Amino acid sequence: MLPTLDARLTAAAELVLPGKPVADIGCDHGKLTAVLAASGKYPRVIGADLRPGPLAKAEQTLEHAGCKDRVELRLGDGLSVLSAGEVGTIVLAGVSAQTTWEIIEQAPWVSQVGGPRLVMVPATRHSELRRWLWDCLLYTSDAADDLLCV
């Protein structure tokens, strides 16, 4: 059975570029990961989390949704689980604004022209994340159209 997403995760899912691989970083329970995989719109879906517990929960969610075989789960810190150019969209949902920008700062390739679309759904401090994006990325990046904050 496919999980139901709340309005913010539904909005995030709708912003993922179809036809390209996608990564759900900080996938936690795996609901968004499962919905993305079950949609059939993406050639590859990666779910990643920092801790084994949430990754195990994501695996259960994927199994119940019948799409475990369409997802690669990775254990690791932020974007260290990805290589530049590996995915077309990265979703960072459910972590704080500060954690979101710390993750982005550790992987400068995400804000380069031709980099992936970055869909951010911070759990807290939305306005601070938007301000940080404006100050640190939007002024210096021609890729601003692919930096989306829900």
PLM regions with names:
Residues 139-144:
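Conserved small/polar residues in nucleotide/adenosyl-binding loops
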Residues 20-26:
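Conserved class I S-adenosyl-L-methionine
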Residues 29-41:
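Conserved SAM-binding loop of SAM-dependent methyltransferases across substrates and taxa
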Residues 1-18, 34, 59-84:
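S-adenosyl-L-methionine
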Residues 114-122:
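Conserved beta-strand signature within the Rossmann-like core of class I S-adenosyl-L-methionine
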Residues 55-56:
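Short alpha-helix immediately C-terminal to the canonical SAM-binding loop
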Residues 44-49:
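Conserved SAM-binding motif I beta-strand of class I
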